[in-house]
C-alpha cells in the first residue's frame, strides 16, 4: 500500500498457505485499519491519491466488481474528494485470475495447500512476468527450491520487496518484465559502449532449413546458474547476484562469416548460440520456438522486418541485436536478497565471533 500501490515492485498477489490464512488475514485487517488515507502533505498520512482520474476509475471499478462478486475481503473509507483509493484486499483463486495489473493500493490474496507449492510456482511463471518476487519462510530447503524455480529478476526472502538499493540490489525483471541489463548491475554501463557490428562482405544466397532449425531450438535447454557474486549490504542481509544463459540466441548473419562471428561472440559470453546455414524469411521468426534473441548485422529494411516479426511473438520479449552482443543480451541476471536475521542470524558473522 506504500505510495498508494503505485510502484512497479509493489505486491499485487499474495499466496498464503491455507493453514495460516485466517490468522494472517485477521492481522492484515488490523494493520490496514491503522492506515491514514489523506493529503500527502500531512506527516500523518500513510496513503495518498493515485495519479489521475483515469487510474482512479480503473481501480475503483475493479474493487466494485470484486465486491459485487463477494470477493472483497476488506477495505477502508476514502476521502470524498480527489483521486483517493483506500487500500483494499480481494480474494482470488490464483494469479491467473488477474488478467491485468491493477496499479494501485489493491492486494489480491490466494490460498494454497502445502503440497501444491510447485503448482503455485508454475502458475506464477506462466504469467510471463517476472520483476520482483517475495518469499517468507523459515524453511531453508523451501527457500532454495523456490529461488531455483521462480522466474523473476529480483527475489526477496523474509523482507519486503520494495526499494532496491543501488550497489547492493541491481534491479530489473525478465520475460515480459524486462530484457536487461539490470539497473545498477555489472552489465549496465557496458551497454552504452557496445561496439558496432562488423561490415558484411557477402550475404547468404541459399535458404536455411527451417525444420532442422526448429528442431535445434527445441533441443536447447536452459542452463544452470553460474556461481553467484556476493554484493555489499548491511549486517543481517545477504545480497547475491547470479547469471544463467538465456534461451537460444539465433545468429542470422547475414553471411556465413558473420554468423560464425556471432556464434563465437555469444559462446564467449556464456550464452547459447544457434547459427543458421542460409537465408530466413523474417516472418518465420514470429513462430520459431524458444528464441531469446536474434542477432542481425545486415541491411536496415530486413532488420525492421525482423523486429516486426519478433514483436508479433507471444511470451517473453525477444530482443533484436544489431551490434556485437554483450553479456546482458545472452544472460539472465538474478538478484536474491535474504534477511538472514529472520532465519536465526548471519552465519558468517557468528563464525567470526567464534574466532575472537
Language-model features: where?
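Conserved C-terminal structural/oligomerization subdomain of aldehyde/semialdehyde dehydrogenase
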Residues: 2, 19, 26-37, 48, ...
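Extended low-complexity, polyampholyte segments enriched in Ser/Thr/Pro and acidic residues
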Residues: 6-8
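Short linear capping/connector segments at secondary-structure termini
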Residues: 42-47
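Short beta-strand to alpha-helix junction loop
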Residues: 50-59
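Glycine-centered, phosphate/nucleic-acid-interacting loop/turn motifs that mediate DNA/RNA or nucleotide
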Residues: 70
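Diglycine-centered glycine-rich loop/turn motifs
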Residues: 73-77
Amino acid at each position: 500500500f506504500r505510495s498508494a500501490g503505485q510502484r512497479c515492485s509493489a505486491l499485487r498477489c499474495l499466496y498464503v498457505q491455507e493453514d495460516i490464512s485466517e490468522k494472517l488475514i485477521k492481522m492484515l485487517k488490523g494493520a490496514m485499519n491503522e492506515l491514514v488515507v489523506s493529503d500527502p502533505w500531512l506527516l500523518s498520512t500513510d496513503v495518498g491519491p493515485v495519479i489521475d482520474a483515469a487510474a482512479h476509475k480503473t481501480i475503483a471499478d475493479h474493487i466494485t466488481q470484486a465486491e459485487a462478486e463477494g470477493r472483497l475481503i476488506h477495505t477502508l473509507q476514502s476521502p470524498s474528494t480527489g483521486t483517493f483509493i483506500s487500500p483494499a484486499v480481494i480474494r482470488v483463486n490464483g494469479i491467473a485470475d488477474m488478467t491485468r495489473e491493477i496499479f494501485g493500493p489493491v492486494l489480491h490474496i490466494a490460498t494454497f495447500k502445502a503440497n501444491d507449492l510447485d503448482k503455485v510456482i508454475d502458475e506464477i511463471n506462466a504469467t510471463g512476468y517476472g520483476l520482483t518476487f517475495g518469499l517468507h519462510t523459515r524453511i531453508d530447503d523451501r527457500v532454495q527450491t523456490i529461488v531455483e524455480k521462480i522466474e523473476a529478476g529480483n527475489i526477496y526472502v523474509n523482507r519486503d520487496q520494495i526499494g532496491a538499493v543501488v550497489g547492493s540490489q541491481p534491479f530489473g525483471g525478465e520475460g515480459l518484465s524486462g530484457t536487461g541489463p539490470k539497473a545498477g548491475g555489472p552489465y549496465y554501463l557496458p551497454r552504452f559502449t557496445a561496439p558496432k557490428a562488423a561490415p558484411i562482405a557477402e550475404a547468404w544466397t541459399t535458404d536455411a532449413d527451417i525444420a532442422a532449425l526448429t528442431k535445434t531450438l527445441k533441443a536447447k535447454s536452459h542452463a544452470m546458474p553460474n556461481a553467484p557474486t556476493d554484493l555489499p549490504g548491511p549486517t543481517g542481509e545477504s545480497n547475491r547476484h547470479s547469471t544463467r544463459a538465456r534461451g537460444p540466441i539465433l545468429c542470422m548473419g547475414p553471411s556465413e562469416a558473420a554468423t560464425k562471428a556471432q556464434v563465437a561472440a555469444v559462446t564467449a559470453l556464456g550464452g547459447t548460440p544457434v547459427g543458421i546455414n542460409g537465408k530466413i524469411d523474417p516472418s518465420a521468426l514470429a513462430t520459431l520456438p524458444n528464441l531469446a534473441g536474434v542477432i542481425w548485422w545486415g541491411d536496415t529494411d530486413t532488420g525492421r522486418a525482423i523486429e516486426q516479426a519478433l514483436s508479433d511473438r507471444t511470451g517473453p520479449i525477444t530482443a533484436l541485436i544489431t551490434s556485437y552482443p554483450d553479456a546482458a543480451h545472452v544472460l539472465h541476471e538474478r538478484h536474491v536478497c535474504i534477511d538472514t536475521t529472520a532465519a536465526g542470524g548471519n552465519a558468517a558473522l557468528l563464525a567470526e565471533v567464534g574466532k575472537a
